[in-house]
């Protein structure tokens, strides 16, 4: 793992990960990392851009449109002593909720990137998920969480590839107009 980045936030270089024709690039914006996923195919670039800040549904900074990530590290994943692929891990905070993220090439699709997100909740969420802008609309990914217990950890995962965004392990994907 690379050492913690001690540079001032305004001088943090982009962090990227790729899988085939898909690349995710994280850039520092204000007080958090934001990202864009691009698919280069057939001479065109299709992109998904994270929507950051308050979610339009909740309009409350405690419930951001996408997980707030304030620290990122690029790591090399290992499994059972064998060398694995690259990964980006991140952590962050919004209100009383703590986020963690793992971003890796999807182990089941050669041309996709998998996002696995966890949020530790201490109060009932108004909104919880990930949101992307694409082609004038919004794509929202939410967890299948049927619990009301607090505190609790909610996990959602999704994969982004040439075919679009797909929920993994019960996550649901919906599309709305912006």
Question: Which stretches of residues belong to each language-model region?
Answer:
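Acidic (Asp/Glu-rich), glycine- and aromatic
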Residues: 114-138
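Extended, loop-rich substrate-binding clefts of extracytoplasmic carbohydrate-active enzymes
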Residues: 59-122
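Solvent-exposed loop and beta-edge segments used for protein-protein assembly and interaction
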Residues: 9, 16-18, 29, 82, ...
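Solvent-exposed, well-ordered amphipathic alpha-helical segments
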Residues: 82-85, 107-110, 135-136, 168, ...
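Intrinsically disordered, low-complexity, charge-dense segments enriched in Lys/Arg
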Residues: 142-157
């Amino acid at each position: 793992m690379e050492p913690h980045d001690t540079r001032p936030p305004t001088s943090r270089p982009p962090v990227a990960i790729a899988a085939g024709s898909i690349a995710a690039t994280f850039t520092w914006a204000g007080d958090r990392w934001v990202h864009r996923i691009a698919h280069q195919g057939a001479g065109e670039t299709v992109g998904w851009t994270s929507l950051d800040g308050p979610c339009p549904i909740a309009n409350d900074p405690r419930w951001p449109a996408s997980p707030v990530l304030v620290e990122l590290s690029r790591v090399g994943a290992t499994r059972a002593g064998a060398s694995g692929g690259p990964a980006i891990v991140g952590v962050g905070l919004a209100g009383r909720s703590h986020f963690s993220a793992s971003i890796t090439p999807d182990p089941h699709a050669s041309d996709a990137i998998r996002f696995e997100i966890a949020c530790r909740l201490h109060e009932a969420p108004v909104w919880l998920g990930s949101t992307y802008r694409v082609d004038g609309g919004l794509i929202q990914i939410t967890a299948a969480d049927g619990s009301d217990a607090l505190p609790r950890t909610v996990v959602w995962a999704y994969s982004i590839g040439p075919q679009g965004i797909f929920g993994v392990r019960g996550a649901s994907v919906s599309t709305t107009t912006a």
